């Protein structure tokens, strides 16, 4: 079936214009005004914004952890993503200790193949350094996995600074990109022990155990290692003024640094950890949600283009049966928030209120820049002829209120409960086929693995 999207406002990162889009054979076939195509089904987008499909470059689906497995697997997580207008995700395949990168990639393909409602790709998290890791990274790139993650925290995941430097050097040679979880792991361990020694065992101890400087110093260290390696760098889930300042300094020194933040760091403050009845546990994530001053600094950075992407770090757990495992010890609360469904809604609401952003800025943050940075562009994140027919017809006059009871995410809460969003996706196309109609996700799992190019 061919589709002709008529009379919409076409939004790209560069601007917006009124026009039509013809989608044929799964691709964008023509752009213009007054387009006609015999046999094409017309989708009237009058009064609507038409975005390229949104891309979430930071998700954790079907991930094993101390609390068992994350609440969302690929079927539930990708259906939830589509409901919000996200047509492609990048999930983190993670190397096991003693395992190879190929074994991790094979495992993630098994998790996702035939079980994804939207398209997907993988980053590869390197957690166990061996001298042949550079060769393994090259093999990943040949298979379309062209980005790698390193952790500076978590004893079971982190590499040494020397090993991080070697990963960065290998990535620079390959034209790959390294992204990093930037928290000082030793400082976190000491902070957790300190809070426990003081008898602070509730959710409020979580942010106290990893204050702002823990992120700021780790960002600075990672970027210094990237500079020594001659590598571009990507900082995930930026949450603090200190981390932002470290990025600014590196950029002033001539480095290429990409910055990502998440909706929770743009909308919530650390007051959530003081909620009664253990409700604060719902918001335990790492890095933690920060102060109003940090929130304001990140909003200004997003408006100024200093932050390139807004992803979710979707790592969902149920409050009952998972989060409450840490009721007597905050360090046992599974770290992570759900957000894969509501990122576009929250960001659109924010753009119309407390953090004014143009539709073009939203497009850049949610679609175009993620695609360009991670080797998906122009197949994804684009309204160009030849791009995949991934489209979001966004109705700015279709308000919704976010409620956990209505969500497709497989969790029993949302951190954005009660948020009033002035607009929402009406129709979502994935590779030229309608997958969301009038806000309802259609059945089926047509999502495909999308190999990515090196830089």
Regions found by a protein language model. Name each.
Residues 86-90, 116-121, 145-147, 225-233, ...:
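Short, surface-exposed connector motifs at secondary-structure boundaries
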Residues 8, 21, 26, 47, ...:
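Divalent metal-coordination and catalytic microenvironments
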Residues 135-310, 326:
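Histidine/acidic residue-rich metal-binding segments in metalloenzymes
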Residues 102-118, 167-180:
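Alpha-helix-loop-beta-strand connector modules within alpha/beta enzyme cores
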Residues 204-230, 280-282, 304, 308-310, ...:
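His/Asp/Glu-enriched, well-ordered alpha-helical/loop segment
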Residues 1-53:
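Histidine-rich, glycine-flanked metal-binding segment
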Residues 45-115, 132:
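Metal-associated gating/positioning segment near the N- to mid-region
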């Amino acid at each position: 079936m061919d589709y002709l999207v008529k009379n919409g406002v076409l939004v790209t990162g560069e601007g917006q214009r009124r026009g039509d889009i013809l989608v044929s054979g799964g691709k964008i076939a023509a752009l213009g005004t007054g387009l006609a195509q015999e046999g094409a089904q017309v989708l009237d987008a009058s009064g609507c914004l038409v975005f390229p499909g949104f891309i979430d470059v930071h998700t954790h689906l079907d991930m094993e952890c101390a609390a068992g497995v994350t609440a969302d697997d690929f079927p539930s997580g990708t259906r939830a993503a589509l409901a919000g207008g996200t047509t492609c995700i990048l999930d983190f395949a993670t190397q096991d200790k003693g395992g190879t990168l190929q074994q991790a990639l094979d495992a993630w393909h098994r998790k996702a193949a035939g079980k994804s409602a939207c398209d997907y790709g993988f980053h590869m998290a390197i957690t166990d350094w061996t001298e042949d890791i550079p060769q393994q990274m090259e093999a990943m790139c040949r298979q379309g996995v062209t980005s790698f993650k390193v952790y500076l925290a978590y004893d079971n995941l982190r590499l040494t600074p020397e090993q991080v430097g070697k990963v960065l050097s290998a990535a620079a040679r390959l034209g790959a990109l390294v992204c990093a979880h930037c928290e000082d792991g030793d400082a976190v361990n000491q902070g957790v022990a300190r809070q426990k020694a003081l008898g602070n065992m509730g959710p409020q101890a979580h942010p106290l155990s990893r204050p702002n400087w823990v992120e700021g110093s780790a960002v600075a260290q990672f970027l210094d290692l990237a500079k020594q390696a001659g590598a571009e760098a990507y900082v995930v889930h930026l949450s603090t003024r200190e981390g932002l300042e470290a990025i600014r300094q590196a950029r002033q020194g001539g480095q290429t640094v990409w910055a990502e933040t998440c909706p929770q760091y743009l909308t919530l403050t650390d007051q959530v950890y003081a909620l009664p009845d253990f409700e604060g546990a719902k918001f335990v994530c790492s890095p933690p949600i920060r102060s109003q001053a940090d929130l304001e600094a990140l909003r200004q950075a997003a408006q100024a283009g200093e932050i390139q992407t807004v992803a979710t770090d979707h790592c969902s757990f149920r409050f009952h049966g998972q989060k409450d495992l840490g009721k007597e010890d905050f360090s046992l609360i599974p770290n992570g928030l759900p957000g894969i469904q509501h990122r576009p809604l929250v960001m659109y609401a924010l753009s119309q209120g407390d953090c004014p952003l143009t539709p073009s800025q939203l497009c850049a943050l949610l679609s175009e820049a993620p695609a360009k940075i991670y080797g998906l562009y122009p197949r994804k994140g684009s309204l160009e002829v030849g791009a995949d027919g991934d489209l979001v017809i966004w109705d700015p006059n279709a308000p919704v209120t976010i409620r956990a009871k209505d969500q497709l995410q497989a969790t029993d809460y949302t951190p954005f409960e009660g948020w009033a969003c002035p607009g929402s996706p009406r129709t979502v196309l994935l590779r030229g086929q309608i997958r969301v109609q009038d806000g309802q996700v259609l059945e089926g799992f047509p999502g495909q693995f999308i190999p990515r190019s090196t830089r």
